[in-house]
């Protein structure tokens, strides 16, 4: 469609443009979901225990860091489209597998043995499992700080990989479209 070409020639970084779009998409989803959350709370407030203000703040910070890490991870695969063409279905499959490994479909605490060790060694636990543990107050401040540092380290690594893949791919890019 030429959308990438249009974004690429703008005076802003293409990464920044896509980051702002990602944040806007998440904000829209949150705004859309908020009335449902409010309804859920008021219809069952006796069953729901809200976290302390400190845990809520730590949870929000953890979510923001996890979102940034996931953004850079996804950018790597989007940058590979320079080399291999449009692979939206592959990217969706990768997102599904990532969500599964991250614990979005079941708590990683249900796992045991080698599988749990593998899932816990991967960075994807920081997308769902760790934020939920923070929300529930199951992590100490020290563990949360270590998690944040680990998320930042993974984010930097994913960003560097993305920049390398993007730099090699943009050399092959031939803008077409509008």
Feature annotation, model-predicted:
Residues 135-138, 150-178:
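Junction motif at the cytosolic side of a transmembrane helix
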Residues 1-37:
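Hydrophobic alpha-helical transmembrane segments of multi-pass membrane transport proteins
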Residues 4-15, 48, 52, 89, ...:
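Juxtamembrane loop-helix boundary motifs flanking transmembrane segments in multi-pass membrane proteins
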Residues 12-24, 53, 57, 61, ...:
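Alpha-helical membrane-protein architecture signal
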Residues 47, 77-78, 82-134:
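Transmembrane helix segments
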Residues 2-3, 72-79, 83, 114-117, ...:
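Membrane-spanning helices that line or support transport/gating and their immediate boundary helices
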